[in-house]
Each structure stands twice: as C-alpha cells, then as structure tokens.
C-alpha cells in the first residue's frame, strides 16, 4: 500500500516538474521572440536592428526587462481600475492554458486530454474577453474601437479555425491531439488536408492579431488600439501573451498538420522544436513582406474565401472517408 502511494507521489512530482519546465520555457521563448522578430525584420530590411547589448544583441531582452520594470505602472484616473488591471492577467493566463494539451513528445505532455481540440477552441475564445475588458476599462475611444475590431475579428475567424480542424478530426477519428499525431506516422496531414492547413494558418494569424491581420492594434489608425493606455508590466503581459499565442498556433499547426514530434534521424523534442521554430520564422517574414489590408478586406477574406474553403474541405473529407 505504501509502495503504491510512493509511486503515485513520484509520478505527480514528475508531472508537476514537466509542467513547470514547459510553461517556463514557453514564457521565456515568448519574451525572446521580440528580439528575434526585430533582428529578422532588420535583416529583411537591410539594417542592423538591436545589436548593442550582449553578443549581437543577444541580451536585449534583459535590457528591455530592466526598462519595463522601472517604468511607471500608471493606471488612468478615468478608467475602471479593477477591470483595467484584470484584463492583461486574463490575456496572459488564457494564452498559457492552451500549452497544457500540446504533445511535445510521446511523454512530454502536461494534460493528455481526450477533448483537446475543444479545449483549445474554448481557450482561444477566452482571449476575446481580455481584449474587450481592456478596451472598455481604458475609457478611451481608440481603445474601444480596437477592442470591438478585435472581438469581431476573433469571433469570425474562430469559425474558420474550428471548421479547418474538423477535417483532421474526421480523418483521425479523435479530438485527442496525441492520437492525431500518431495517426500521421506514414503521411502528414498537410498533404491530404492542405486546404485545411491554409485556412488554419490564416485563421491562426488572425486570432493572434499578427500582421497582416493586426487591425485591432494598427498604429496609424488607432494609436495601438486597446493597448493605448497600458504601460509597464501590464503592457508587457499583453505583449508577451501575443507572442505566446503565436507559439501556440505554430505548435498546433505542427501537431495537426506536420506530424508533431514524428520524423526521421532526430529525437522527438528536437523535431518538434525545429518545426515550430521554422513556422515562427514564416510568421515574422510575412509581417516583413505583406502590407496591412483594410478592416473590411480582412472580414471579406474570412467570410468569402476562408469559409467556402473550409466547407469544401470538410465536405470532400467526408466523401473520401465514406468511400
């Protein structure tokens, strides 16, 4: 009896250790993505970028952290104080929650959830509340317009995100991400589900508010949108949560369409990290290469292009499975 309790205790400690390590690494990577993006954009635009702190600017994150810590943590007197403080915390926590169900390797997974896809869709929908609360609590017209834009964009593209995943779910027969990865042992889903991959990629960028879908934060129109009244640590929480969302979307693309940890020659964790890193590079290069469309064009892309594509993909997948 005591032996079994010791085994359970050791297993719980091991699982908690894995969870803490994964979450800390993801937060650190989310913070470091700012430096990586600035360096890559500088390389793309034929300039130097941040290169003064550390070797080739590698310690720029430390300099940014010191700057943020010593900034005034100001709360506007005309804002709703409780909601204003709560919004970035909700954004940060909701961005981390989706990490719980991602299978990095066959053994490195925090929560092996049988309804992992539904949990991911629920967490992605939760981010709308943080944005709306931030825009409303700021009591600023630009923040409110940005929040309304973000809510409409997120709710619209969540439809296409969910429909693009349904083809993969129908093919593998499960909502469990680990089973979906194991189903891609001989053929990655990106080949039979290429249309679903394209729509998931576009919808994922829209949910992250990544360029060219960053209308809620467009500096030229809204002076940074719902971020406008935030500074210091609270702004950093929004900033890091945006990059964590980008890492989450890249990880889900790898899991759903590129075989997850599976591949030749290298250990599973190295393969997963490499695939995710390459997708993050693609996200950054898209920001460097493409202009920002108008807000009405963003909604048109969703409802008139992505929606028919996802419905066609789901229908064709169902026909192939039935035949």
From Swiss-Prot:
GO cellular component terms listed in the entry, alphabetical order: plasma membrane
Keywords associated with the record: Cell inner membrane, Cell membrane, Membrane, NAD, Quinone, Translocase, Transmembrane, Transmembrane helix, Ubiquinone
TM helices/strands, residue ranges: 16-36, 82-102, 115-135, 150-170, 187-207, 238-258, 266-286, 303-323
One Pfam family linked to the record: NADHdh
EC number: 7.1.1.-
UniProt subcellular location: Cell inner membrane
Bilayer disposition of the protein: Multi-pass membrane protein
GO biological process, one term: aerobic respiration
Keyword Transmembrane: yes
Chief location of this protein within or outside the cell: membrane
GO molecular function per UniProt: NADH dehydrogenase activity; oxidoreductase activity, acting on NAD(P)H, quinone or similar compound as acceptor; quinone binding
Keyword Lipid metabolism: no
Chemical reaction(s) catalysed: a quinone + NADH + 5 H(+)(in) = a quinol + NAD(+) + 4 H(+)(out)
HAMAP family: NDH1_NuoH (MF_01350)
Its biological purpose: NDH-1 shuttles electrons from NADH, via FMN and iron-sulfur (Fe-S) centers, to quinones in the respiratory chain. The immediate electron acceptor for the enzyme in this species is believed to be ubiquinone. Couples the redox reaction to proton translocation (for every two electrons transferred, four hydrogen ions are translocated across the cytoplasmic membrane), and thus conserves the redox energy in a proton gradient. This subunit may bind ubiquinone.
Family: Belongs to the complex I subunit 1 family.
Subunit structure as annotated in this protein's UniProt entry: NDH-1 is composed of 13 different subunits. Subunits NuoA, H, J, K, L, M, N constitute the membrane sector of the complex.
Protein name, UniProt field: NADH-quinone oxidoreductase subunit H
Species, as recorded: Blochmanniella pennsylvanica (strain BPEN)
Taxonomic placement: Bacteria, Pseudomonadati, Pseudomonadota, Gammaproteobacteria, Enterobacterales
Gene: nuoH
């Amino acid at each position: 009896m005591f032996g079994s309790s010791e085994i359970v205790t050791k297993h719980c400690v091991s699982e908690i250790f894995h969870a803490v390590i994964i979450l800390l690494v993801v937060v650190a990577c989310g913070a470091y993505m700012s430096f990586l993006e600035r360096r890559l954009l500088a390389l793309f635009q034929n300039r130097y970028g941040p290169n003064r702190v550390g070797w080739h600017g590698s310690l720029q994150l430390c300099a940014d952290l010191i700057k943020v810590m010593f900034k005034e943590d100001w709360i506007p007197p005309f804002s709703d104080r409780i909601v204003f403080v709560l919004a970035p915390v909700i954004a940060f926590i909701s961005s981390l929650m989706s990490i719980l169900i991602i299978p990095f390797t066959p053994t490195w997974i925090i929560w092996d959830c049988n309804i992992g896809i539904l949990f991911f869709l629920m967490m992605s929908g939760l981010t709308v509340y943080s944005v709306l609360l931030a825009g409303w609590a700021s009591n600023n017209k630009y923040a409110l317009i940005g929040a309304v834009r973000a809510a409409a964009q997120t709710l619209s593209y969540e439809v296409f995100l969910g429909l693009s995943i349904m083809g993969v779910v129908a093919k593998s027969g499960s909502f469990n991400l680990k089973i979906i990865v194991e189903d891609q042992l001989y053929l990655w889903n990106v080949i039979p589900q290429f249309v679903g991959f394209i729509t998931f990629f576009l919808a994922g960028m829209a949910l992250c508010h990544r360029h060219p879908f960053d209308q809620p934060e467009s500096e030229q129109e809204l002076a940074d949108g719902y971020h406008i009244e935030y500074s210091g640590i609270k702004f950093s929480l929004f900033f890091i949560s945006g990059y964590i969302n980008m890492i989450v979307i890249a990880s889900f693309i790898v899991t759903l369409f590129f075989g997850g940890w599976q591949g030749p020659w290298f250990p599973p964790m190295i393969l997963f990290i490499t695939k995710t890193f390459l997708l993050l590079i693609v996200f950054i290069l898209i920001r460097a290469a493409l202009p920002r469309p108008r807000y009405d064009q963003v909604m048109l892309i969703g409802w008139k292009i992505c929606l028919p594509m996802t419905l066609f993909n789901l229908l064709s997948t169902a026909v192939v499975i039935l035949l």
